[in-house]
Amino acid sequence: MLKNLRNKIKEKLTYSLLSSQEFDNNKDYYQQPCPEDNANLWSRLTFGWAQRMLISGYFNGPLEMSDINDLPKDIKVQSSIQLLNNINLNKNNNSRWPLIKHFYKQFLYRNKLTIFLQILTNILSILSPLSLKYFIQFIQSTNKERSFLAGIGYCILLLIASFSYTFSQQLLMWFAMKSSLEIKGCLSIKVYEKTLKLTTCGGKNYNPGSIMNLLSVDVGIISNFFWIEHMGIFAFSSQMIGLLALLCWVIGWSGLVGFAIMVITFPINTYIGSKIGKNLKESMGYSDKRTNLTSEFINGIRFLKMYAWEKLFLDRIEEQRSLQLKYLYKRMIFWIFAEMMKQAVNAIVLVLTFIVYSINNEITLEVAFTTISIFVSLRIPLLRLPNSIQQLQSLIPIAKRVEDFLKSPEIQQNHSSNREEEEEDEYDDDINSDGDISIHNGSFNWNQVDSNGSGNGNGNQQQQQQQQQQQQQQQQQQQQQSYTLNNINFKAPAGKLTIICGVVGSGKTSLVSGLIGEIYKVSGRVNTPNKISFTTQQSFLLSTSLRENILFGNEMNLERYKKVIEACCLAPDLLQLAAKDLTEIGERGINLSGGQKQRISLARALYANSDCYILDEPLSAVDPEVATHLFNHCIQGMMNDKTRILITHQLQFIPSADHIVVVDNGKLVQGTYSELKSKGIDFESIMKTKKLNIDNQQQQQQHEKENDIVLSDEDSNNSIKNNNNISNLIDIDEVISDENDSNLIERSKLLVDEDRNEGSVNLRVYKEYFKHGSSIPLFIMTCIVYMISQIIYQMSDFWLSTWSQRSIPDKTDKYYISIYLLFIVGFIIFLVIRYFMMAHVTFSASKNLHQSLLKSVGFASCQFFDTNPSGRILNRFSKDISDVDLLLFDLFSDVLYCGSTVLVSIGIMIYISPLIIIPFLLLIGIYYFIQRLYTESSRELKRLEAISRSPIFSLLQESFNGLVTIRSYKQQNKFISMMQDRINTNHRLSYYGFSVHRWVAVRLEFISSIVVFLAAFFSLFNSNAGFSVLSVTTALGMCSYLNWTVRQMVELEVKMNSVERIESYLNIPKEGNSKINFFRNEQQEEEEEEEEEFDFDNDDYDGFKLSKKWLTKGEIEFRNVEIKYGHSGESSLKNFTLKINQKDHIGIVGRTGAGKSTIGNGLFRMVECSKGSILIDGVDISKIGLHELRSSLGIVPQDPFIFSGTIRLNIDPFNKYTDSEIWVALEKVKLKSTISSMPLKLETMIEEGGDGLSFGQKQLLCLSRTILKNSKVVLMDEATSGIDYVTSDLIKQTINNCFKNCTMLTIAHRLDTIIDSTKIAVIDKGKLIEYDTPNNLIENQESRFSKLVKHHHNLFKEK
């Protein structure tokens, strides 16, 4: 029955509200144009075009994206970007606040209608006090002079005066909101475009965390200012002048007393505003640092867990958070003082005005309540003008942060010349006559930036010429400067294979970076083709399907795609994936092995069909068999007719090169293999010495033949020719999935959809919030104090009514003034108390929520990070925490302040006119229905808007990580288009969220105006003129609060979504057992060292005790271990059994994806065993605390993890070792000379990711950590894959010496690094297929290892 009634109401409402508009529950509105575009004038004025969404959201359940229409074209980012087309942010622009000034100019030029509405609103603000003045005159007139029809006319006049003012306000806010969205859109996309242009040097000051703060916080503050506050200083000033003139007309010059007080308080408010802005700026700076560290923490979470360094990073983040909170607290204190000033000034102005007026005049009803009405109207500009000044002062540092980012160094423009430009160039000579890639007299420097490339404006030519002259002068002065690459000449013949080789840190990556424009070109000339494919040493992958990562924005060519899959040897890997090539790849390829990631990058380059391929170590992470296949079928196969530049340490391929470039300490020697040998350059000696003496090449003629690992040209070529296609037994069609298969697509998903709660925010969320904010009783007391303060304030008006009528005989004005002052003082006292109580609650909640969130995420399982993109997680720490920090205090204060004001006002009106409760009940019913209609839709729109932010941040994170790849493929426009779509989606939800609010505001304001009419109407029948006027005045004052209460209640619920989203992360799955030793202080550790045994501080261990002398041997045993990633899918290790004796050095080999790295993940419990167990020294590691386990093991990971901080901090984060011990470790890994040559040595700062260090140097730095740690069990996961053979040979000696008393597991594709191992374990498809000594395995001609060795240049024979 109720359901039928609901449907009937729905049908009636749909018909009445939508009129002739078509309403279809099943229609997809996502692609439909904005209904405002085709709405008639009435619908535009009343926002009736937004009704469909309101009805759909209320009757059809939660709104979905299919219910949301498209944006108007002028609001889309593609249009709004024009706002910043002509801005000049050049470094030589000395204008102050260029961004703010530019937006003001654009606003004045583009928003004349908004300016007109602001003027109209100011004029209409005078109408209500005037109407009240004439109504009071009518009420005070004798019964003979009063006409009932005239009274009705005055009531209608009050209704019109009230509604016209608020109605014009709604239209004003709507058009201002459109401008705000345009500004937000153009700034957001400009920040993203700038991100894609950042140089390596420019990027050092910014990382995804700080840029995300710019997008989520700074841009939002700027756009909000230009929505509400941008006209405040001018509009509220003019409104105050108009109302002040009216006040002087009513009470004479006494009105100037109040004005004088306001003028006096302006400097105080300005000073407080400046303090608020200053503290906000400081807090934002620490917020950036905190977000940067959090971003770094999330990106490196796997490494941090393996190193057991979570505590280190959590402490660093908390340190920045504490500093941020320090300034947020100061800001809050100043904010409270500002609010106290505003509220107190309102009251004091009224008191002093009446005191001065009463000296020579008698306070009458007309004077008293017309003055009150004027001051009620003045209350908005009185409150908002200081707030606008304060907001402008706060905006200046925020805008400066955005300006500084937009001015940061960009990638160098005109870095290289293409072939068409070469023909007309003055340097055109035989260097590039055949279309070769070349560098002519080139000098490059990582630390220098392009001064002309920074900024986004169109600076004038004179400024640019001056900059160029200054740059030339600097270059002349720095001729003696040592560049990264100085005055080099390089040539890669067109259509040929050029191989670049050299020792670690010699400048190989810098050389190719010079070709693609990633390093600043100081001088010289670079010639490159138009289309280049570049693969980085650390692969860049998007969080999308494997297929999309290969296509990378190009159209699908099925035949070429199949050939690419075959050439890159991906077919066997794809067969093992759930959805084949449609399998979703996690962020940074977390569900792939290193070799698989490199081959996908190589496939992307190959599919692009470019003119030139630059490949930086694409063969280092694959086994010899796959490396040979890639070289034969990809580099020398499908790429054969293209120019190829290959950086590699794989010596077996060097004789096959058409051109070879040897790089040593920034110097180049180049030629064919035979030419270099004739010059005395022999690759045997290159790999046997740390540094080449290029100037004495002719003297290097003798080589140590016993260590010769290079094949002759003929042998090498034969080896490659004899290699068979290792994927020729696989039907390529089997690995290409049907993208229309919904079941397959579902299985391919790795990332989980973001949680979205439906309906109102659960009461539990509020309870949890207040529990984090001290206590629930404290909040209840705060609510009571708010109510008491507003009752006292309203009683002052009640007393004024008594005063104006002299209701108490024989009392002088002094008596009335004293009581009135008592009310005002009481109000101010309770005002201070309520604000400080609310500040304590919200500040404590903010502090504790972040602490709980950080702890929860820090201890989360790895699966959580695998299935949630980092941008989504970081969104909790940036936008959601920012909302909790900056908005909830204001919102709770507003709701309690406005809500208590409305309740007290209604109580007064019912007390004065009891009969008014009858129409009130009807209006309350209508009011409640409209409010629910609005709340259901607005809340879901806000939730969708919050969810739509995560894809923006995820794309930003991925783009920043892949800047070099995106730029080398010239895919900036594609990524900008992707970001535009995501911003438009986010703004679409904001736009319709604003529209439904304007819809409800117009209707609630009309109801408020009816309340004014009813209060005036019932006052016609009241014999007490004072009470009658008080009722009408109270109704007029309540109008502005009623709609604001509803708006702020919904806004509060929306922002509580941030709390809800944070709390959803407080209960995420944690890793196995708790981490003992984690929160113990040094004294506890010393006490425990004196004991023979210690207990785990966790109930899960059931009294299990771990011997203090655990892990003294290093024996490892895998017993029938089975490990799988996630709850579904194939196991990565299957019935895996392996026993390793103490001090054994075990080499682990197998093709990529065989399960080698899973052994390490299982050992460190990065993933738990689904079956079986792993024992170390006889103890099942599943019973050992994770921190205890991981801190006892050593690891050198495949992808080196370098975090921001000093070199010392990266090597010894807990400050356990002396300088001499650190230097010894660095000397052992051959980094001592490199580090000691740096000006600050161990205190040299390194940026996140180790910018400034080569890939090999990063690996060596990680190795130095493990050497210092001196663990009994060490895992080496491709630890030397990025290191040349000579350094690798020296490091191998170091490893053998340093870890001779350790049990070591070495995962490697370069067999020379494991040939001396005690035993070799061969893994295939998650199973142990061979396990024996290297001698025994090689002597067995049928063994897999023996065949691998043959593919690796017969290394064993040379032993």
From Swiss-Prot:
GO process annotations (BP): sorocarp development; transmembrane transport
Major subcellular site: membrane
Keywords, in A-Z order: ATP-binding, Coiled coil, Membrane, Nucleotide-binding, Repeat, Transmembrane, Transmembrane helix, Transport
Protein name per the record: ABC transporter C family member 1
Record's keyword annotation contains Transmembrane: yes
Segments passing through the bilayer: 119-139, 147-167, 214-234, 244-264, 332-352, 363-383, 773-793, 819-839, 884-904, 906-926, 999-1021
Cell location: Membrane
Origin organism lineage: Eukaryota, Amoebozoa, Evosea, Eumycetozoa, Dictyostelia
Ranges of compositional bias, category Polar residues: 440-450
Organism: Dictyostelium discoideum (Social amoeba)
Family annotation (SMART domains): AAA
Low complexity composition-biased segments: 459-478
